[in-house]
């Protein structure tokens, strides 16, 4: 099981390496994944844990997958145009130290982070619980409890010129925001390593 999870070995490689049948490998992997899934905390439990923290970090990550050979473009939902890879979108909830609190069920990789968080009810549950959320700019306009970095205003539609640069104060706020959000990337790294 560890060889499957850690190295991504195929069932055929596992069967050959351990000298067991392919059906046995399939059964062992399914049983182990079912046990791990049963041990995972629910969103309700995760929000209860988050309520006891000063803030939580929400971030989405793309877990790469092999391209599935589907005809007729049925694999398109799994292709992330942002990352130029096939994968699944997983929402991650982490504490201020970067420890994993909760991960969402996987959605197709083409799904935007905020759309995925809304589909799982993550943002609504955190807002209802009054939890302060630190997130990246993908979660802009999510809700009042979600803090995102300032962004430079868009171009003026009439002249095409940038309206203004970020002020020194806005840059300082963005820098502090990035320091708070940084440990959340560690939680994402735990999923990928």
Regions found by a protein language model. Name each.
Residues 1-7:
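Short, amphipathic alpha-helical "recognition" segments used to contact nucleic acids or chromatin
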Residues 13, 17-27, 34-37, 41-193:
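Short, well-ordered secondary-structure "scaffold" segments embedded in the functional core
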């Amino acid at each position: 099981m560890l060889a499957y999870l850690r190295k991504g070995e195929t069932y055929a490689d596992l069967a050959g390496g351990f000298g067991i049948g392919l059906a046995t490998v399939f059964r062992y992997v399914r049983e182990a994944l079912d046990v791990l899934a049963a041990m995972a905390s629910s969103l309700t439990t995760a929000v209860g844990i988050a309520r006891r923290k000063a803030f939580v970090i929400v971030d989405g990550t793309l877990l790469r997958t092999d391209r599935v050979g589907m005809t007729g473009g049925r694999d398109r939902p799994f292709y992330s145009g942002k990352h130029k890879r096939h994968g699944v979108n997983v929402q991650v909830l982490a504490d201020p130290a970067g420890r994993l609190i909760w991960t969402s069920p996987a959605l197709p990789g083409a799904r935007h982070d905020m759309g995925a968080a809304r589909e799982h009810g993550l943002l609504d549950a955190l807002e209802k619980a009054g939890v302060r959320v630190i997130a990246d700019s993908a979660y802009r306009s999510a809700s009042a409890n979600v803090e995102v970095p300032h962004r430079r205003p868009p171009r003026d539609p009439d002249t095409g010129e940038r309206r203004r640069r970020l002020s020194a104060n806005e840059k300082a706020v963005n820098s502090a925001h990035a320091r708070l959000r940084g440990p959340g990337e560690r939680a994402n790294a735990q999923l990928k390593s």
